[in-house]
Swiss-Prot record:
It catalyses: RNA(n) + a ribonucleoside 5'-triphosphate = RNA(n+1) + diphosphate. It is an enzyme of class 2 (transferase). This is DNA-directed RNA polymerase subunit alpha. GO terms for cellular component: cytoplasm; DNA-directed RNA polymerase complex. Its EC number is 2.7.7.6. Homodimer. The RNAP catalytic core consists of 2 alpha, 1 beta, 1 beta' and 1 omega subunit. When a sigma factor is associated with the core the holoenzyme is formed, which can initiate transcription. The N-terminal domain is essential for RNAP assembly and basal transcription, whereas the C-terminal domain is involved in interaction with transcriptional regulators and with upstream promoter elements. The keyword Secreted does not apply. InterPro entries: DNA-dir_RNA_pol_insert (IPR011262), DNA-dir_RNA_pol_RpoA/D/Rpb3 (IPR011263), DNA-dir_RpoA (IPR011773), RBP11-like (IPR036603), RNAP_asu_C (IPR011260), RNApol_insert_sf (IPR036643). Gene3D superfamilies: 5' to 3' exonuclease, C-terminal subdomain, DNA-directed RNA polymerase, insert domain, RNA polymerase, RBP11-like subunit.
Length: 317
């Protein structure tokens, strides 16, 4: 069985806080950029676990359409503010779906922010400046938020069915996904071979409760664990190497141009053009090589003959 090229994967751009990342994987055979990109995108959006509030309890409020004396916002507005809360709940301390309580009680006039919440061990609020409500003169806010780790999106109706929900709680919609945006695309690349290759470009942005690189790694592991089930369908399958080690051709492409036995004039022209390896040489079109400053017809012929002798080709226009 013909081996696939083993791609390299890396970060090409990252925000200072690492909540945004741009990643590339190459070389991939034609069609694999879309196959892998779509699978990663769907898994990132639907299956990345995170933390969210699923219910609240406010003293003096029985439902979300209540107004509270001394509080500027009604319960509906408080719920909308709570939905913006970004949490991180330590999965090493709390099991999946284990409820944690975040509390605040105050009669101090002014805004009540997420940083005012009293948190149990292993729980962190990332957007502490978020205003949850404003207390007016004579008002008192006694608020409990119920949160947990999970996946996906749950409506307030679905959350009403949870065993932890008791009378007095107001359930809300909960979005557990920490992923804000995922985009992917592909671009063709030239390796100096007749076969078509492409590059996967993946962009991921999170809410800060998980790093973009960690989210991509986790999504990959989720996919691998599911695909692994299908490898057991046949008990007797000949072991084949799908991803081979670096081939002789690949190693040859990384050879410095100094080792290609060019004349000194041709070598100097290539070096001045920023071409240091055979890979960089064949990634250029023939027109680009011809346009290299001070490269004469004799040197051009020498370079073309060398590339042809190695059974490689220049990038197509």
């Amino acid at each position: 069985m013909k081996q696939f090229n083993k791609p390299e994967f890396g970060i090409v751009k990252e925000s200072p806080n690492k909540f945004y990342g741009k990643f590339e994987a190459a070389p991939l055979e034609r069609g694999f950029a879309v196959t892998l990109g779509n699978a990663l995108r769907r898994t990132l959006l639907s299956s990345t676990p995170g933390a969210s509030v699923f219910a609240i309890k406010i003293a003096g409020a029985q439902h979300e359409f209540t107004s509270i004396s001394g509080i500027e916002e009604n319960v509906t507005r408080i719920v909308l503010n709570v939905k913006k809360l970004i949490l991180r709940i330590d999965s090493a301390i709390y099991n999946d779906d284990e409820t944690v309580e975040l509390k605040v009680g105050t009669s101090t006039i002014g805004p009540v922010t997420a940083g005012s919440l009293v948190l149990p061990a292993g729980v962190e609020v990332l957007n502490k400046d978020l205003v949850i409500a404003n207390v007016a003169e004579g008002g008192n806010l006694d608020l409990v938020l119920y949160a947990k780790n999970s996946r996906g999106y749950k409506t307030f109706k679905e959350n009403k069915e949870l065993k932890d929900v008791v009378p007095g709680m107001i359930t809300i919609d909960s979005n557990y996904s920490p992923i804000i945006k995922v985009a992917y695309g592909s671009t063709p690349i030239n390796l100096g071979k007749a076969q078509d290759f492409e590059k996967l470009i993946l962009e991921v942005e999170t809410d800060g409760s998980i790093l973009a690189s960690d989210a991509v790694s986790l999504a990959s592991k989720i996919l691998i664990s599911h695909f692994d089930v299908f490898t057991t369908l046949a008990e007797e399958v000949e072991e084949v190497a799908i991803m081979g080690v670096e081939t002789v051709e690949e190693k040859e492409l990384d050879k410095p141009v100094e080792e290609l036995e060019f004349t000194q004039r041709s070598l100097n022209c290539l070096k001045r053009a920023g071409i240091s390896t055979l890979r960089e040489l064949v990634s250029k079109t023939e027109d680009e090589i011809q346009d290299i400053r001070n490269l004469g017809r004799k040197s051009l012929k020498e370079i073309k003959d060398k590339v042809a002798a190695l059974e490689l080709t220049f990038k197509q226009n």
